[in-house]
Each structure stands twice: as C-alpha cells, then as structure tokens.
C-alpha cells in the first residue's frame, strides 16, 4: 500500500514537472534559460507574460490564440529588435501599476548586473533606493481625463531618475553610491478605458502599465569618456560656480575659459531655461547624478547653442563627502540667432553697435576689467541695450509706410529695435545714435519749440535755451527724429497729464462736459497749429470754423487727441482771442497796425527766441454777423484780413513753452476769467457802451465740474474763475487803464439752449 502511494506521488510530481517544463517552453525566452528555471520562476515569468499580453495584445508576436507563422520578414524583425537593444545603451522595462516588473530586456544585466529572469515578475521597489519609493509611486499614479467618454486610450509622459541596485564589479559598474546606480528613465504611462455593460460611454479608466527606457549616466572621470568635437567638460562647485572649463568651450560658445570662471552656470543660461536647470541641480544634489533637459547656453557674440549636460557629484576620496560637480556637455546645434544679445556679458564682450551718446564717449569693450573698474568709470561709459536684436530688420522704411497717410511713423522711419549684423552695423558711419534705433536725421527733438528751416536742414543739433540736453537726448531715444520733408505727427502736446479729479471713464467724460471739436494741422516747420482748435457751440455739432476744418480733420494725427487736450487747447485759443479783443477795445481804430507789439503783455507765448508776432482775433459767436465791422478785422503782419481769409496761416504757440524750465512764469497776480459753456452769447443789439451785469445763471450746473479741475500749465484752479474780486482786480491790473470786463459777457435770452457760446479765459502775464 505504501509502495503504491509513493509511486503515485512520484508520478504526480513527474507529470507536474513535465507540465512546468512544457509551460517554460512556451515562454518567449531562449531554451538555455528556460531549461534551468525552477517552478517558482516559471510561475512568476508566466504570470508576467500573461499580464503583458493584456497590455500589448499583439505587441509580442502573433495574436493570442493564433498559430505562429514564420516568415523571413518576422526573422528580420526579431534580429533587428535585438540589435536595437544592443545599440540602445540602456534597457527597456514595463512595470505594472502595483510595481511588478512585467518585462525587462536582457541588456539590464550590462548596466545593473541583474539578470532578466531575476528581475521579471518581482517588484521594482526591491531594486530601487528606499528614498525613491515615493517618487516611483507618484510615477505610477494616473489621473482621469476631463472628457472621459471621448478618449478610449491615452498615454502620459514620464521622465524620472531612479537609484537602482547594481551588483557589478566596481571597475565595470561606473559610479555607484552605496551599491546603487542612477538610472535615467523616460517613457509613458498607458491608460485604457474599460466599458461597462450598463453604459458603454461611462467606463472606468485603469492604469495598465509604465513603459520606459533606462539609461545609465556617463561616469564622472573625464579620462573614462572620449570628448568629441561637439563636447566640452567643466568642473563646478556644489552651487554651480564654474571652477574649470575645457578649452573646447571657446570653439563652441565663443567664450574663453577665463571668461566663465568664477561665475555660476545660471549666469550664462537663457532665462527661460533656468527653472529646468534648477530642477536638475536639485536632483543632482539629492541623487548624485543627473541628465539635464535641453537648455540654451548663451554664446559670446550673441545668440545661443542648445546643450545637454550629464552631471555627476564627485566625492572626496578621504572623507567621502561631496567635493565638486563634473559635467560632460553635448553641444547639439550651431549658434542660433547670432547678434541677438540677451546678457550684459554678451554686449560688453562684443563692440556695441549703438550707444546713447555720441561715439566719442568711451564704451565698454573688455569684459575682464572687473566690477571695480566698471563702477569707477560708469559716468563716462554709456549703457547699451540689454535686449537686441535680430539682423533681419533693416533701417530702411517698410514698403507699406512709403504711401502711408501719416507720412511715415517713427517705428518704420527709424531702425527697428534689433541689432544688425557686424557687417551692417552703422557705428562707424554715424557719430550719434541710439541703443534701439538708428537715426538718419539728427535734427532738433525739442518738439515744444518752433523748428526753423535752418534747424531741419543743418546737421548740427541746436539746443534752445529752454531745452535741456539730457531731455533732448531722451526725446531722441523715445520718439525718434522728425524726418526732413516729412511731417511728423508726434509732439510734446500729446503727453499732457490728466488731473486726478478728471473722470476716469470715457462715458463719464462725455456726460460731464460738452463736445469740443478739435482740428489739427501741421506746419511745414514741424509742429502743431494751436490756432486751429475751435469750440463747438453744443454737443454733437461743429461751429462755423469747425465746419471749414472738418474735411481735413485728423489728416496728420495718428490718433484722436484726448478731451482734456482739446479743452486746454480751446481754452488757450479763447484766451488769445479775448486778449486781442481787449486790446482792440483799448486801442483806437486808427492804430490797429500796432496791435502786434501791444498785445504781447497778454500773450501766453513765453518764448525766449525770435518768433512771429501774435495775432489779434475776434471770438466767433453765434450772432457774429450782426456785430460791428471792426470786430471782424484781424491784424496779421501789417495786413487787414477777414477772419475767414487766412485761417490756414495761424502762428501757433507750443504748450511746452508754458512749462519749459527757462520760460517766463505766470505770476500769482495773473488772474483768469472763464465763462465755460454758460447760457450766454453775444447779443446782436448790444453796443460797446452797454455794461450788462452778469446773470446768476453763470453759476450753473457746470460749476461743480469746473471746480474739480485745475490747469496744470498755469497753476490756477477753476474754482476762482467766477470770483467777483478776481474780475475787479483784473481790470485794475491792466496798467491802470479802465475797462469793464462784463462788457464781453453778453447774456443769451433763451436759457434752454444749454452749452452754447464761447469759452473765454483772460490772463494778464507779468
């Protein structure tokens, strides 16, 4: 009985072993390996193989359940796959969501010393550093997509560094730390959707595995790796401060080794790549080795080269402490964007093409003079552009700009903010230029002052007395130079500041003040015509003068001026009109030819150079046709003209002269009288001898708005404009001559016509 049971057990074990051997033969492994496998290894490898067939149903040979068909193409494919693994300089592995290694290529033994059979089916956590377990868990964790029903299968990219166990001999293992070797793993996480029976569109997603390739990093010793022509090596401290560089860096980047020593690697890397470099630096300090992502290393003469670095921490042989960082760098491209300067070292290393001042000013040409010499001579050296500059842009105007209705813009008339190639740089041809723009015309940029014809045609730049040379140079830098023969559209009046009390929104502004139609025209001398500003009697309509100018409105201005600008210009126009009107009333009718000289005391033209005589004009009202004939006369350069005959020949006064440093100041005794948008007009039945009183309607709904605004150019607030004491003092301050100011305020009988009439401000300049 015992003999029978022993024989039965032996027979059962033999059958079991034969079944295991038959199962081992089915594994995609060489027969030399499968014949030596034990039962546990056969079960472990078989389960791993079955999991792999789920992940890749047709990726490992023929489809499941189909008979194998051998063909010459299949044999070639298998041989090619084995050769690819040999030339890969790494190994392929597939990890299940639970960390089990479903597949790993036999080339892993070359890098780790562990066989394929030993690793397959076992947990990867058994072969990686304990400090990397959390990172591996995070790599294997997937997140469900936002639109799950649209995606059947997707992949998530993964790139990470693992310290894997290495049992190779020390001379063949390369750099190991505590028996672990740093492996750079890159691949993807495969996610698949499994449909449910109840709802085929709302299936659950399952992580089916990680497919990755592992590369061992190069060794740290330079003698163990051959440096090719596109490679260079550097040694740095633990904070990436460069200590030593290979001489090949000069050929690849243009920098000499001594130019880079004592500076960190971050100093010479493109700003957009510093974050990736910082992450790699952190991994290097934690794990001892790292492969950086592709980053841009700045070249000496502008541009950059793409580089990838393999860095390793070298330990002290005596203390076993980290000593320094050794990096082998692969330069992958030639210099890109030559001439594009992104660092001050690049600019100082090469001759700057532009400077803020003339070429006689010394510039920084030597990068190795040190910080002390640069600080000591900072006053005499000009700073250059920290950004630059593509060589594809030229100084000529664009084709579309030649026929532009604006007559050329400063962005196309001047050079583009890009540097030219060294062969095209105009530094030797122009003695004065700018860091961002090259100017063909170096004439005056004092736009607030009149530009005579001689100032436009001469090469030298004239600084007027009220102009500061530094501000003029700043104007050339920001605005460009007005081109001779072309009408520039910029000027100092385009930058008038808004007061804090002014409405912030456009709607509030339009609702709080009447419409003012502003018309602009450019003289041949290169500045705006101030006298072309007219005031509209009511919102939405233009005055008599505004209709004449409507056809050429904004022909030269690139943008519509703001309403505060038009208000200031309209106010100045009416100041001039009222002053000349007072002078006409004061002077006898036979002495109208002398108004040009007598009107200067009331003029706002505080210029300190020769200028055309001011004009005497009559304020145009709605009932202008019924006034006396003498009120229609304008005196201009000794000629008696009608106000409609020479509207295009006004002599403007630039607003910048009012606030210029050397201009005459308006004394505190100067008083302003304004009647802005009141219910008043010039009565056709009013004579010069009548003296009507000011109606209380003058203090209408607009008083609250006017009280909030101050004219920054004169320093007076509008809240004092309607003071009776102010009006009385004004009449007493005009050289003792008596005349009644209220004679100019004609009340309109119809109070329903709101915002109709002209705005008048009277000032007495000392």
Swiss-Prot record:
It comes from the Eukaryota. A motif (Nuclear localization signal) lies at residues 368-387. Residues 353-365, 649-662 have a biased composition (Polar residues). Residues 77-147, 218-288 form the PAS domain. SMART domains: HLH, PAC, PAS. Residues 336-766 form the Single-minded C-terminal domain. Gene3D superfamilies: Helix-loop-helix DNA-binding domain (4.10.280.10), PAS domain (3.30.450.20). Keywords: Developmental protein, Differentiation, DNA-binding, Neurogenesis, Nucleus, Repeat, Transcription, Transcription regulation. It is found in: Nucleus. Efficient DNA binding requires dimerization with another bHLH protein. Heterodimer; forms a heterodimer with ARNT, ARNT2. Transcriptional factor that may have pleiotropic effects during embryogenesis and in the adult. This is Single-minded homolog 1. It comes from Pan troglodytes. The lineage of its organism: Eukaryota, Metazoa, Chordata, Craniata, Vertebrata.
């Amino acid at each position: 009985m015992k003999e029978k049971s022993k024989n039965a057990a032996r027979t059962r074990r033999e059958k079991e072993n034969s079944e295991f051997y038959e199962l081992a033969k089915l594994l995609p492994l060489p027969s030399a390996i499968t014949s030596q496998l034990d039962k546990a290894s056969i079960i472990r490898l078989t389960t791993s193989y079955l999991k792999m067939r789920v992940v890749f149903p047709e990726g490992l040979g023929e489809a499941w359940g189909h008979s194998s068909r051998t063909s010459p193409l299949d044999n070639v494919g298998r041989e090619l796959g084995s050769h690819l693994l040999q030339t890969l300089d790494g190994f392929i592995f597939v990890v299940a969501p639970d960390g089990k290694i479903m597949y790993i290529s036999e080339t892993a033994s070359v890098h780790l010393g562990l066989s394929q059979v030993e690793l397959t089916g076992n947990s990867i956590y058994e072969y990686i550093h304990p400090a990397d377990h959390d990172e591996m868990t995070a790599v294997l964790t997937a997140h469900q997509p936002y639109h799950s029903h649209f995606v059947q299968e997707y992949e998530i990219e993964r790139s990470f560094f693992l310290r894997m166990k290495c049992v190779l001999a020390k001379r063949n293992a390369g750099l190991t730390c505590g028996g672990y070797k740093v492996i750079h793993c890159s691949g993807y996480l495969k996610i698949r959707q499994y449909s449910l029976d109840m709802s085929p569109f709302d299936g659950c997603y399952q992580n089916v595995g990680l497919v990755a390739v592992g590369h061992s990093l190069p060794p740290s010793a330079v003698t163990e790796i051959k440096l090719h022509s596109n490679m260079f090596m550097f040694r740095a401290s633990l904070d990436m401060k460069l200590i030593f560089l290979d001489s090949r860096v000069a050929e690849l980047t243009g920098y000499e080794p001594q130019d880079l020593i004592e500076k960190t690697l971050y100093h010479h890397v493109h700003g957009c790549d510093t974050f990736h470099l910082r992450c790699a630096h952190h991994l290097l300090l934690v794990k001892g080795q790292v492969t950086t992502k592709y980053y841009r290393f700045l070249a000496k003469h502008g541009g950059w080269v793409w580089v990838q670095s393999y860095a390793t921490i070298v330990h002290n042989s005596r203390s076993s402490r980290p000593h320094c960082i050794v990096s082998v760098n692969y330069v992958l491209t030639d210099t890109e964007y030559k001439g594009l300067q992104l660092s001050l070292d690049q600019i100082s290393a090469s001759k700057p093409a532009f400077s803020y001042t003339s070429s006689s000013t010394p510039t920084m040409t030597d990068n190795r003079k040190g910080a002390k010499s640069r600080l000591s001579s900072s006053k005499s050296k000009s700073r250059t552009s920290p950004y630059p500059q593509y060589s594809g842009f030229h100084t000529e105007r664009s084709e579309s700009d030649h026929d532009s209705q604006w007559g050329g813009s400063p962005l196309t008339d001047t050079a583009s903010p890009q540097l030219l190639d060294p062969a095209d740089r105009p530094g030797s041809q122009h003695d004065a230029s700018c860091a961002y723009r090259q100017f063909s015309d170096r004439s005056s940029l004092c736009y607030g002052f009149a530009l005579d014809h001689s100032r436009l045609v001469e090469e030298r730049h004239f600084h007027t007395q009220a102009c500061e040379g530094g501000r003029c140079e700043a104007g050339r830098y920001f605005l460009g130079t007005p081109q001779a023969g072309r009408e520039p559209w910029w000027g100092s009046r385009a930058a008038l500041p808004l007061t804090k009390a002014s409405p912030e929104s456009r709607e509030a502004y339009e609702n709080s003040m009447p419409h003012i139609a502003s018309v602009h025209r450019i003289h041949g001398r290169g500045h705006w015509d101030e006298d072309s500003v007219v005031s509209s009697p009511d919102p939405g309509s233009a005055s008599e003068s505004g209709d004449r100018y409507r056809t050429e409105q904004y022909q030269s201005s690139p943008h519509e001026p703001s309403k505060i600008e038009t208000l200031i210009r309209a106010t100045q126009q009416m100041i001039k009109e009222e002053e000349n009107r007072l002078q006409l009333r004061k002077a006898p009718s036979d002495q109208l030819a002398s108004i040009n000289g007598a009107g200067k005391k009331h003029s706002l033209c505080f210029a300190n150079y020769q200028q055309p005589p001011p004009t005497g004009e009559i304020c145009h009202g709605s009932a202008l046709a019924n006034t006396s004939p003498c009120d229609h006369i304008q005196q201009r350069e000794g000629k008696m003209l009608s106000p409609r005959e020479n509207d295009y020949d006004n002599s403007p006064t630039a607003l910048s002269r009012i606030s210029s440093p050397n201009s005459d100041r308006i004394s505190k005794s100067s008083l302003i009288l304004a009647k802005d948008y009141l219910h008043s007009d010039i009565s056709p039945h009013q004579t010069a001898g009548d003296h009507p009183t000011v109606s209380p309607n003058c203090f209408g709904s607009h008083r609250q708005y006017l009280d909030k605004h101050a004219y920054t150019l004169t320093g007076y607030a509008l809240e004092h404009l309607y003071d009776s004491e102010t009006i009385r003092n004004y009449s007493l301050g005009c050289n003792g001559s008596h005349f009644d100011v209220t004679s100019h305020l004609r009340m309109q009988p119809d109070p329903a016509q709101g915002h109709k009439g002209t705005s008048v401000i009277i000032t007495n300049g000392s």
